[in-house]
Design a protein with these regions (language model features):
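Catalytic-loop region of hydrolases
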Residues: 2-105
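Accessory cap/linker subdomain of secreted extracellular hydrolases
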Residues: 239-335
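Short beta-strand/loop motif that positions the catalytic acidic residue
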Residues: 339, 344-351
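C-terminal catalytic histidine-bearing segment of alpha/beta-hydrolase fold enzymes
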Residues: 322-331, 344, 353, 360-464
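Loop/turn elements at helix/coil->beta-strand transitions in domains of secreted/extracellular proteins
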Residues: 108-111, 155-160, 199-201, 229-232, ...
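Primarily recognizes the serine-hydrolase "nucleophile elbow" in alpha/beta-hydrolase
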Residues: 186-257
């Protein structure tokens, strides 16, 4: 049976401040080598952390980041262990990686919370490990995403990159990715060495599995973290309907993705564990266990064309139609709550992983509940290419929100390519230059344009 929906009854802001003062955060030295999170003592909180307020920093350390674990990133970076909340409202701890341009952030700089497409259960895929110098995280997407979100640093923004799946790696679980992202923001804003104003503006961005986590953060923010000044959220190809995605990908080249979701959800939903124990053969359970130890790309390659029916006595259509499964999937579905911040949703019409019809329906659910959604459907991109191609558009849209540029009324627009939009092509050169700096180990500093919007009123009206 699915857990009851958690209703936050957290501490008021003054109580949060008093709670934080009772346990001083520890300052650790920078790690001498990258250690997988489940073997790194930094990730284990001290006893008594449970009574602290959400977002309280438990310990911090400077960290050296690197592209692909090898090419040192010339930025300022720290890891923060902080108190957060799990699916059932219980206290837990996780880590966010806070990154700033090499010269630091200027007064008034915003914070971007970037939710990586972790899309795996193995702690090797957690961004706090994968982005460290010396990590062995072949097959994770964080390194590709780094080439995109590094461009935010050249705008003078700071970035929080949370391990939004938590230490269990429960990919696909609802609500808790949002809690972890929002508490990571709280931690980053209160971390004095980061140089941010505690009341700084915040933007949310994520793609694919990171878009799913970003959607949960946007949905949960009004009730869970109403004090945060979130200017807007960019949802890139989020998972709009998990049941549809299971049916769509089972037996396909990307069949490893739904198997990873099952491996993650069985850790937090008894109904999923019972389904696996009852209906999967020993070989099927072994497939899930091996997937749980794999990075995303490794699982996808290993399980290409895998069909669940091979190792189940019951066809997948019947499994997913069981009453217990329907209750779980209802709990997993986005769109029950209306985000109160403006949303930019970007989706490929011919996406081979996430069906555009599922995102159409998610956008409609949000609008029906009063959310403001700018929805761009891209005819020229598939799932992987849309992230880099939509990066200039995403960052320019967030820059406008930080600058106070008024959003256009909610609308849907289908385009040949997001690069054909003024806000999509502007900034492409900056993206290429920042990716070059990452790949060649050059310093990443804030450019002279700063963190505001460069757009004229006419451009603001016609970009999206």
């Amino acid at each position: 049976m699915a857990p009851a929906r958690h209703r936050r009854t957290g501490l008021a802001l003054p109580q949060r401040a008093r709670a934080q003062s009772r346990m001083k955060p520890e300052s650790w030295a920078a790690p001498t080598r990258a250690v997988v999170p489940d073997k790194d003592p930094f990730y284990t909180p001290r006893p008594g952390f449970e009574s602290l307020a959400e977002g309280t920093i438990l310990r911090s350390r400077p960290v050296e980041l690197a592209a692909f674990g090898l090419i040192g990133l010339k930025v300022r970076a720290w890891q923060l262990l902080y108190r957060t909340t799990d699916l059932n409202g219980m206290p837990e701890a996780t880590v966010t990686t806070v990154v700033a341009p090499l010269g630091g952030v200027a007064p008034g700089a915003p914070l971007l919370s970037f939710q990586c497409a972790i899309d795996a259960i193995s702690p090797r895929a957690f961004p706090s490990y994968a982005l460290q110098r010396g990590s062995r995280a072949i097959g994770t997407f964080a390194h590709v995403e780094l080439l995109c979100f590094a461009d935010a640093l050249t705008r003078g923004w700071a970035i929080s990159i949370p391990d939004h799946e938590g230490m269990l790696g429960a990919w696909g679980a609802p609500r808790e990715p949002g809690y972890r992202a929002l508490d990571g923001i709280r931690a980053a804003l209160s971390f004095e060495p980061g140089g941010l104003d505690p009341s700084a503006q915040v933007g949310l961005w994520g793609y694919s599995g990171g878009g799913l986590a970003t959607a949960w953060a946007a949905e949960m923010a009004p009730s869970y973290a109403p004090e945060l000044d979130i200017a807007g959220a960019v949802l890139g190809s989020p998972v709009g309907d998990l049941v549809s995605t299971f049916h769509r990908l089972n037996g396909s080249l990307h069949a490893g993705l739904p198997m990873l979701v099952v491996a993650g959800l069985r850790r937090v939903y008894p109904a999923f564990e019972e389904l696996v124990a009852t209906h999967f053969s020993d070989e099927g359970r072994a497939v899930l266990d091996k997937a749980a130890r794999s990075t995303t790309a490794a699982a996808v390659m290993r399980l290409a064309r895998y069909n669940v029916d091979r190792h189940s006595g019951t066809p997948i259509a019947e499994l997913l139609a069981m009453e217990a499964m329907l209750a779980v999937f209802a709990d997993l579905t986005l769109g029950d709550r209306a985000p109160t911040v403006p949303l930019l949703v970007v989706q490929g019409v011919h996406d081979q992983i996430i069906a555009v019809e599922d995102i159409d329906a998610l956008v409609q659910r949000y609008r029906d509940r009063g959310a403001h959604v700018t929805y761009l459907r891209d005819r020229g991109s598939e799932h992987i290419s849309l992230l880099p191609l939509s990066t200039p558009l995403s960052l320019n849209w967030l820059a406008d929100r930080f600058a106070g540029v008024a959003v256009t009324p909610s609308h849907t627009r289908t385009v040949r390519s997001v690069l054909a939009l003024p806000a999509g092509s502007r900034g492409l050169g900056s993206l290429v230059r920042s990716a070059f700096r990452v790949l060649f180990g050059r310093p990443i500093t804030a450019s002279a344009t700063g963190h505001g919007s460069e757009r004229t009123g006419r451009e603001a009206r016609h970009a999206a």
